[in-house]
Amino acid sequence: METETATTPTGNTEPTAAASAEPPKSDKVTVRLRNIADAPVLKNKKMVVNPTDTVASFILKLRKLLNIQANNSLFLYIDNTFAPSPDTTFETLSRCYSVKITDKEILELQYSITPAYG
């Protein structure tokens, strides 16, 4: 593999930004879900979402998968501790809270239909 270089004004050659940049991260975020208390259990506990998706849009998708009506509550938690803000993107959540499992980063979330923490 050939490294891209550029010549500086002093005549030296240096690697370009493209050559020294980190490899791009995956364009999706892997989410592992776990139910808390009396919340329905999902058949598929792993989901892949776009990093630009918000928590609010994810909760809407999760409501459909769990057949939870709009008049019933659905709570989402990180680290069994706190609920992320609905306008937070999965890129931000992944960057701050993902755990590395077998060379993959996974965002672990818990969901409940009754308040569980805080």
From Swiss-Prot:
Membrane topology: Peripheral membrane protein
A biological process term (GO) from this entry: autophagy
Short name of one Pfam family: APG12
Cross-link (Glycyl lysine isopeptide (Gly-Lys) (interchain with K-129 in atg-5)): G118
Subcellular location, record wording: Preautophagosomal structure membrane
Residue ranges with Low complexity bias: 1-23
Task performed by this protein: Ubiquitin-like protein involved in autophagy vesicles formation. Conjugation with atg-5 through a ubiquitin-like conjugating system involving also atg-7 as an E1-like activating enzyme and atg-10 as an E2-like conjugating enzyme, is essential for its function. Most likely a component of an atg-5-lgg-3-atg-16 complex that promotes autophagosome formation by associating with lgg-2, but not lgg-1, at the preautophagosomal membrane. Probably, as part of an atg-5-lgg-3-atg-16 complex, required for lgg-1 lipidation; the complex acts as an E3-like enzyme promoting atg-3-mediated lgg-1 lipidation.
UniProt similarity note: Belongs to the ATG12 family.
Protein name as it appears in the record: Ubiquitin-like protein atg-12
Gene source species: Caenorhabditis elegans
Gene: lgg-3
